[in-house]
């Protein structure tokens, strides 16, 4: 039953995706935007547009699951911004979906904070944050250095706190409170079923 349900959901998603791409092909195409976080030169989106659409930020959105998330929210007519270290894939995803790409290494606290603060300044608020970015270094624990372990946590776990904290601080100071908000953290069953060589990854996903 579960397998059939998942298959149906996947088929429905693929159908919506195909329809959206068809509409983009023959209708008005969205234009992707690329931002360098430190420049702060992006045009501000009017406040009335902000009220009509959900404002979404995704970490690690250039490829894989992150890209699928960016595509899904773009198809749902949301305002979508995402960050990634892969410049080429990030620009391509932004072009395909009409989203906004920020080239950011999330393990760099200042870069990630600048990115989130820039988006909050331009959009006025964020309705949804999806902490998706993740890396792994599968190696025996005896061959995993403290630096390797710290790197995994600095990418997989710490950004969850950074993005959530910044949004909480921002919301606290809003003149008109936003009653809507979602913070979605992509986890993994690995934290419950750790295997040899995945100690750092398991710790980061269970954090």
Question: What residues fall within each predicted segment?
Answer:
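Canonical Rossmann dinucleotide-binding motif of NAD(H)/NADP(H)-dependent dehydrogenases/reductases
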Residues: 51-79
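Conserved glycine-rich Rossmann-like NAD(P)H-binding loop of the short-chain dehydrogenase/reductase
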Residues: 76-91
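Substrate-binding pocket helix/loop in short-chain dehydrogenase/reductase
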Residues: 140-141, 145-153
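Active-site loop immediately N-terminal to the catalytic Tyr-X3-Lys motif
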Residues: 142, 193-199
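Active-site helix of classical SDR
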Residues: 164, 204
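Residue(s) in the substrate-gating loop at a strand-loop-helix junction
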Residues: 188
């Amino acid at each position: 039953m579960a397998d059939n349900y998942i298959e149906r959901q996947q088929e429905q998603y693929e159908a919506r995706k195909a329809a959206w791409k068809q509409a983009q092909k023959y209708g008005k195409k969205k234009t992707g935007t690329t931002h360098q976080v430190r420049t702060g030169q992006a045009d501000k989106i009017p406040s009335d547009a902000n009220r009509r659409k959900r404002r979404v930020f995704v970490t690690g959105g250039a490829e894989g699951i992150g890209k699928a998330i960016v595509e899904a929210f773009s198809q749902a007519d949301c305002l979508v911004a995402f960050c990634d270290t892969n410049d080429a894939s990030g620009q391509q995803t932004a072009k395909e979906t009409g989203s906004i790409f920020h080239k950011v290494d999330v393990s760099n606290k200042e870069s990630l904070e600048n990115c989130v603060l820039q988006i909050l300044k331009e959009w006025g608020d964020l309705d949804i944050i999806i902490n998706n970015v993740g890396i792994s270094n599968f190696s025996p624990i005896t061959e995993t250095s403290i630096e390797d372990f710290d790197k995994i946590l600095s990418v997989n776990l710490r950004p969850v706190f950074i993005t959530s904290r910044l949004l909480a601080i921002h919301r606290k100071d809003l003149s008109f409170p936003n009653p809507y908000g979602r913070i979605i953290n992509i986890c993994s069953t690995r934290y419950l079923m750790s295997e040899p060589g995945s100690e750092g990854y398991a710790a980061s996903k269970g954090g």
